[in-house]
Amino acid sequence: MKKLISVLCLLALTLSMLSGCGAPAAPETTAAPETTAAAEAPTEAPTAAPVSVRLGAMTGPTGIGMVKLFEDADQDAASGYSYTIKGAADELTPMLLQEELDIVSVPANLASVLYNKTEGGVRALAVNVLGVLYIAEFGSDDVSSVADLKGKTIYATGKGSTPEYFLRYVLTRNGLDPDKDVTIDFKSEPSEVVAVLNAEGSGIAMLPQPYVIAAAGQLGENFKIKLSVSEEWEKVGAGSLCTTACILVRTKFAEEHPEAVEKFLSDFAFAAAWVNENVEEAGELCGKFEIVKAPVAKKAIPKCNIVCITGSEMRSALGGCLQVLFEQNPKAVGGNLPGDDFYYGA
C-alpha cells in the first residue's frame, strides 16, 4: 500500500508537467471388480469464465478509436468489455494503478512516465493516435512548407509539454532554430489563440484536433490548414512517428489473461478501422459518449490519425518518438526511456 501511495504521489507531480483457480479435486473411486471393468466416459476440464476487460479512455482524440467498443459494451452485456471515460489523465491513471482498470488509452509520453513510476507495471499494447497537431494560417497565404515559417510568429498551446517538443523537433530537423528563426508565442488555451488571430486579422497557429476544426468554425474560410506536424515528422523522423497516444495494459493483467489481451488487440484493430470508415456514425458515438461533440467529431476524425500499430512497428514508431522527447526533456518521459519489456509483442 505504501508503494502504491508513493507511485500515485509521484504520478500527480509528473502530471503537473503536462484467480488462479486450481482444478477441483477428483472424487475418490472404489476399484471395480476385475471381472467387469466398465469403460468410463471421459470428463471435460472445466472451462474458465470469460474475462471482462475494464477499459479506460479520455475525452478528445485519445478516446475516439474506442467508441465502437463502448457502444458494443452498451448493446451486448456479453461483449467482454466495460468502460470508464474521464476528462483528464490524472483522473484516469490512478484507476489503472489501483487495478480498477485493465487497459487504458493515454498520451504517449505519459505511458513512459507510468512505466518508470511503476517499475514496469504497465506495457504498451498499441499506438492508437498519431499526430493531431496542425499549423494553420489566418488572413494570409504565406506558408506552404516548414521553411516558410522562418521569421514568423507561431501562436500555440502546450508550452513545456509534447506540443512544444514536437514543434521544436520538426523545426530543427528542417534547419530552423526554434529560438532564433521563429517566435513561438504560447497561450494557455486554444480559445486564446483564436482570440488573438481574430483580433489581429491574420497570423499563424499550431493547434491540435479537434480544436483546429472548432477554430475554423469561428474564424471562417480564411483560416486554413497549411501543414500537418505528423506528416512533416514522417519526412524527417527516420522511422519514428509523431505519436499522440498509445494503449496501456497492466503487466499483471497481461500475464494472467493473455487470451483477453489478444482478443482486445483484434477487437480494437477492427474498431479503429471502423471509425475511419464510418465517420458519420463514429461522430455520433463520439457525441453520445461525450468524447468530442458530434458535429466537430465528424469533421475532425479524418484528421485525427486514428490507427492500431502493434508489435515491432509500434516499437519503432513509439520508441523513436519517446527518444525525441527524452533528448529535449528527460522528465517528459519519466526520466528514462522504457526498457524492451515495455513494448508488448515486439
Which role does the model predict for each range below?
Residues G319, Q323-A346:
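Conserved C-terminal helix/tail region of periplasmic/extracytoplasmic solute-binding proteins
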Residues D74-Y81, E232-S240, V307-R315:
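Short, solvent-exposed loop/beta-turn-alpha elements that line the ligand-binding surface or hinge
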Residues A32, A38-A41, A45-D179, I184-F186, ...:
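Short, glycine-/small- and polar/acidic-enriched structural segments
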Residues C9-M17, L325:
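Hydrophobic core
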